[in-house]
């Protein structure tokens, strides 16, 4: 496979201005060989725990599990059934080569999007495809990829080594037995660590909450019939996760509202949840209270606390009923941090044992609330641009709106936050390039010295993520 | 009239970086001759229906009807009376040459604004004025323009042909008899189409609501004494508009709140409106319900639905009382789409017969709500940057904040949304230039191939608007 | 002290694109010698009133009073005690050379921040330090600065002359006797003017409200036992401030909510405040009403009204209890202008005797609300980017989001809003550079003529601030 012009420009993400571009290359060259630190993501640990695991067909690797791909195709009229997504009650396409062809015919939809950039990078740098995917070469490329994916050197484990990943944190339910991590550790893969994510039991409106609680009961080996027992369960599970290598927790909620309920109030809400008779406001009050409790536990056990806020999950009820969650139908919400975090920060904001990393998709809060909070409280770090904003422009907005107030050292560097294992190097590549180009812009504008630029590039590419998540 | 340096730079809107600028020119050259598609605007069809129509004096063309011009002059202390705006009760300036002189003396206020750019383009490219307007040459330029405007080749019809407008959609009240469109169609001008805009009757707080309803009654030839009849009236009028060539409807509201009222609730509110005794919240509830009804009708008759949300009309009560609406005193509001559109999208968001184009002036919702919604729902397209944001920076923000998530193919291309007929080419010119410069930036940054750039330029300049409004 | 490369780039804040950069230099050269107009700030007039006043140690000058510096160091774990901040009850570091060393060791935190840029400028241009501060040279630089600061030519008065400040407005409590200004005026320093800031008495939840009221009583020489007397007191004090050279007032509040209470309502709230029994909402209602009253008084006495809105003061209660206000723990809030200012603008928005300058830190309101309001009402001007946004990117966002709608002539130019006297030239330098670079961008993009660029540069650097505050 040969073409004249590379599919993937060596200058990608860099300013066309020659002096800035040259400097961006220099910064990038100085950090591009650093290992990848992946402190927050959603890779299935089973992929790595089982040496015989394979990615399946190109369609199983690139299309079916990727909600960014699904949503864009769906938005232009491609039914999810035609993409092989399992439905509750109807047949779905099973010919993966045909799905791939359909995808290739619509690949133009991803022009200028991060998904398009990642995919080009993966095809080029992971699989050696050196032509742009289109409807004519789709079948040929499919066959080529299918051949490679069957080879041991394209197994998840082999790629894990090739990707130079120094540490990879997974995200795991509070009730998870972490068997995959255990077996990986026994094999020496201690750099794969769990993260404690209790959303399924602490958000009282989570789908299947009662079943999730039952799983939590199983994990601690006793019944959870009161709020007090529930909190004990969380504490026990955190201790277990920590023993299994976790350094952090994570929680998602529609809003970063925090509040401190009395024990009686918390017990009353929990009791109503158990009998399935929640009052209006119970969900928000309980989640807001658990944020406080999780902060308290972080002070006690030293796990870094993460908050991901501001998404309305499953916005499309018909799609959710038919195909379930994570099909690209989650839509961000506007949020407010200054007032909502006030109770939590009043209690724990100055505590040297506490660390909180916050993520949101309301970019209007970057310069107004997030950077000022991180630029004052010793306990707060800012997570990188999240989800829809994990893109060239999204990162540039983040740098330009956050860094003047918070400085880079109040951020947590980068994390890829992905379940698409093969996209990890591509995502870090974009971050590192955009960061280096931003720094080159600061230097060419006389705002930062060249020497400082090299230090900052390394911090953004590597050091900050490690130290933020206590991985050093 | 000769000057050395052109008033209008051939490089306008393009980056000074030479490589990007060259490519922007190439993209622009490839699309600049494409016809103009104008699927949403406010040109008075009478201007075109009457072959003898003229624009009047330069002041009547450029100043008196342009609320962008009026608001800026008013904001710096120029009374609207001095600009010839009719008042309810007092004399107003009638010497148009004097008004033009006053305008020229204040023309520096428009430095760096879109109004300034449009006006320079119109003077140069429509009228051949090749010097910058100022207080010294104002009278001379006035006389020159006055001479031209009397000529048949500067009649609205002549300019319509010269402007290479492929289709022009007007905006018309629900009760409009569309006589102008009818006579235009009979003359062969079938490319001039109406748009169904029922704001005056569906927004129960619209000025003169009762009179507007009376007109609607006349248009259907019977009394509207109930909500049920009202809905029938809307359906009948939509059918009439569709027969007269309409492909779309439009609605404006302070908020995109949608809700489904029961028939009894809707009847009760409508009954209160008829007797002029609305309860608090009635207006918002009724408009929110009508949004749902308009979506249902769109599913049935195939008209594209448009929503323009987030403006407080007539913010300045003293000005409104004296001079009426549309004098530059409408101020945008913050809005929310994710929760507000949820009811409507839950009902119609996946319906293949439905199409919804949304517009807002709360740019914080571009990346947070609008692009994610359009990047998921097959029914949603994003309208171009609207009103105050129909500008070089406004468009760049739109491209940078929308396209990574929604891609360009979930947008409706450009529309000029103007009542200033003569400004139409200038407005499309700015859009096409900014789009080409943005694409050149993507190519020089290695994010899009040059070949893709040409395709995207054509789509943004022409194809997307046609297909979004079902004009192809 | 000699190094090869200057610490402060002569190209700082300018685009690396050569044509734009050259033009930016030309614009900057044309305005850099203009005097500084400082119509809003917080310099202590005692510094200037007393010819023998000195700045103290380098630590007293640069660190202890600067809440930008304090918050960043605190955010990375440096205790305020170690920085010499007085606490209510515990010892604090008193060795200023040691504090300076600690600061230098953490100076990398300010990379790319406005504080870092200002400090480099001050060290270079005010004190002639020509090397970058670091942990190794910290002691040497401290000694050097300490030596200079003892010299008469580095007294506040000497620097005032050297800085070429044409006018400097201070900010003073309503009860202030303005003795410093009086003595300055007697010495001929009439360019130092007070500003009337009644927050401490009109915001009923201001710390020490009762004591503040007592001071106000003293200043007018009689008791304030009713709302009516309170309003009279404000009027009397405004008259006194005006006599002492004030041309403006200023008010800060969490929100720009305005409302008109009846006399009875206002009296009732004031009576509750006097007995310390406020109802929920009283504070916001009263402040909102006083905004209206202050506007009325501005119409009567011609003082320019300023509103600074959208900050939650003292967000960190533990820090506040220990160290008091203004230690970097104020966090911005989202705000709304369109609805909140509606009552005030309905009453005074068209009044030729009224002028209102508004400031906020919610940048999402720049293009959505602030620019449209200023681009319509003849009474509104926009203040420059404030507080956290007084930075290179903050200014660029302001220019790009405000100017297309409001034009530059509806803004109030620049003010430094600082209590750090020595940083004044550095802050104006950043504004002037960013403005010139922005204008050079407009010219090189063909949006503004070069000649217009020179006019606009002068307006932004000098004229607008003078005329906005009636200082011409």
From Swiss-Prot, chains A, B, C:
Share an example GO biological-process annotation for this protein.
Answer: D-galacturonate catabolic process
Part of which pathway?
A: Carbohydrate metabolism; pentose and glucuronate interconversion
Source domain of life: Bacteria
Which EC numbers characterise this protein's activity in its record?
5.3.1.12
Q: Which Pfam families match?
A: UxaC
InterPro entries given in the database record: Metal_Hydrolase (IPR032466), Uronate_isomerase (IPR003766)
Molecular function (GO) terms for this protein are: glucuronate isomerase activity
Q: Which UniProt keywords apply?
A: Isomerase
This enzyme catalyses: D-glucuronate = D-fructuronate; aldehydo-D-galacturonate = keto-D-tagaturonate
Q: What family is reported?
A: Belongs to the metallo-dependent hydrolases superfamily. Uronate isomerase family.
This chain belongs to the protein called Uronate isomerase
Task: Name the source organism.
Answer: Nostoc punctiforme (strain ATCC 29133 / PCC 73102)
- Lineage of the native species? Bacteria, Bacillati, Cyanobacteriota, Cyanophyceae, Nostocales
């Amino acid at each position: 496979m040969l073409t004249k012009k590379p599919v993937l420009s060596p200058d990608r993400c860099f300013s066309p201005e020659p002096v800035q571009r040259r400097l961006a290359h220099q910064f990038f060259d100085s950090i591009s060989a650093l290992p990848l630190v992946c402190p927050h993501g959603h890779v299935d640990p089973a992929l790595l725990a089982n040496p015989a695991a394979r990615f399946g067909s190109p369609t199983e690797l690139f299309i079916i599990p990727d909600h960014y791909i699904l949503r864009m195709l769906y938005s232009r009229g491609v039914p999810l059934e035609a993409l092989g997504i399992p439905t509750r009650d109807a047949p779905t396409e099973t010919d993966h080569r045909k799905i791939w062809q359909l995808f290739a015919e619509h690949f133009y939809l991803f022009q200028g999007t991060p998904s398009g950039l990642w995919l080009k990078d993966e095809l080029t740098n992971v699989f050696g495809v050196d032509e742009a995917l289109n409807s004519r070469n789709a079948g040929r490329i499919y066959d080529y990829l299918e051949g490679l994916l069957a080879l041991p050197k394209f197994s998840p484990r082999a790629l894990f080594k090739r990707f130079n990943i120094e540490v990879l944190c997974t995200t795991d339910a509070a009730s998870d037995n972490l068997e995959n991590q255990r077996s990986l550790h026994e094999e020496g893969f201690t750099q794969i660590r769990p993260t404690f994510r209790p959303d399924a039991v602490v958000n009282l409106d989570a789908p299947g909450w009662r079943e999730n609680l039952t799983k939590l009961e199983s994990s601690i080996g006793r019944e959870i019939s009161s709020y007090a027992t529930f909190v004990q369960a969380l504490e026990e599970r955190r201790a277990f996760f920590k023993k299994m290598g976790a350094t952090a927790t994570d929680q998602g909620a529609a809003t970063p509202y925090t509040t401190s309920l009395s024990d009686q109030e918390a017990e009353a809400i929990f009791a109503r949840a158990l009998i399935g008779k929640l009052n209006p406001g119970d969900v928000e009050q309980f989640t807001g209270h658990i944020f406080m409790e999780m902060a308290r536990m972080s002070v006690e056990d030293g796990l870094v606390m993460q908050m991901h806020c501001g998404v309305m999950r499953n916005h499309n009820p018909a799609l959710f009923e038919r195909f379930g969650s994570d099909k690209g139908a989650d839509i961000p919400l506007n949020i407010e941090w200054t007032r909502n975090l006030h109770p939590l920060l009043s209690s724990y904001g100055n505590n040297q044992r506490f660390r909180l990393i916050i993520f949101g998709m309301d970019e209007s809060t970057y310069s107004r609330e997030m950077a000022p909070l991180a630029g004052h409280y010793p306990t707060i770090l800012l997570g990188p641009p999240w989800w829809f904003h994990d893109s060239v422009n999204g990162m540039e907005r983040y740098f330009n709106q956050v860094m003047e107030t918070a400085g880079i050292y109040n951020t947590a560097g980068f994390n890829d936050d992905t379940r698409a294992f093969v996209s990890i190097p591509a995502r870090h590549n974009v971050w590192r390039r955009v960061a280096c180009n931003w720094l080159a812009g600061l230097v060419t504008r006389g705002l930062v010295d060249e020497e400082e630029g090299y230090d900052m590039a390394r911090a953004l590419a590597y050091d900050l993520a490690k130290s933020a998540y206590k991985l050093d």
